[in-house]
């Protein structure tokens, strides 16, 4: 999500630009939301980590390496700058641009990059990725220019009546270890309910929806989406 505005701003500066996007298969829908993304190449980091030396992992990696090196790219940029993305950058037979040692999210991800760019770590992730791509492509980023460029027409609009003021509680997370307990969410809902503010809990799949419904079951002011 954080990289989408960087693509939109690149389009404002380079009219005929387009992108291929490498992403973990669990998040493959995200780049499909942006009209500038031509091809999506998926990785399978979670299974690779679980059984790195297995035959299936070797075959999966070989397939990904072939896909990564099919395109004749003008530029390859690692927007994530962590160890997982650096591993993918290492597999690409092309010079890769990424953040330098002082800027990268995880050490020593910067070692995978041929060209290293300094980006202020104090910036929000969206601004960091915009600045990285802007420096890589040679244009100056605009502050507070955040356009996700998502094709919202492809999303189903919830059939709900929104109050003038409401709170969105994002209870879902990609890793179980990052999830707050249902009991903690319900305690938060009770406290917000005391303030008289309605709450919405969005979900991205059926499992998340069931969890959101359980969390909301204690209050008529909380709604699972």
Located regions from the model:
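Catalytic machinery of carbohydrate-active enzymes
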Residues: 1-225
């Amino acid at each position: 999500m954080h990289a989408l505005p960087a693509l939109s701003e690149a389009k404002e500066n380079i009219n005929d630009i387009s992108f291929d996007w490498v992403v973990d298969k669990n998040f493959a829908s995200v780049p499909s939301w942006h009209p500038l993304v031509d091809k999506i190449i998926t990785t399978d980091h979670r299974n690779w980590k679980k059984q790195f030396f297995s035959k299936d992992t070797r075959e999966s990696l070989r397939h990904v390496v072939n896909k990564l090196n099919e395109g004749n790219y003008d530029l390859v940029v690692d927007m994530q700058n962590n160890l997982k993305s650096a591993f993918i950058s290492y597999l690409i037979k092309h010079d890769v641009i990424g953040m330098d040692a002082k800027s990268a999210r995880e050490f020593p991800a910067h070692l995978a990059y041929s060209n290293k760019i300094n980006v202020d770590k104090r910036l929000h992730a969206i601004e960091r990725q915009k600045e990285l791509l802007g420096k890589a492509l040679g244009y100056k980023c605009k502050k507070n220019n955040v356009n996700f460029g998502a094709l919202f027409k492809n999303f189903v609009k919830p059939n709900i009546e929104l109050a003038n003021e409401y709170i969105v509680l994002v209870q879902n997370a990609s890793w179980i270890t990052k999830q707050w307990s249902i009991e903690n969410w319900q305690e938060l809902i009770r406290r917000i309910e005391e303030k008289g503010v309605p709450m919405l809990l969005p979900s991205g799949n059926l499992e998340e929806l069931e969890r959101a419904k359980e969390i909301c079951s204690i209050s008529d002011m909380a709604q699972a989406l």
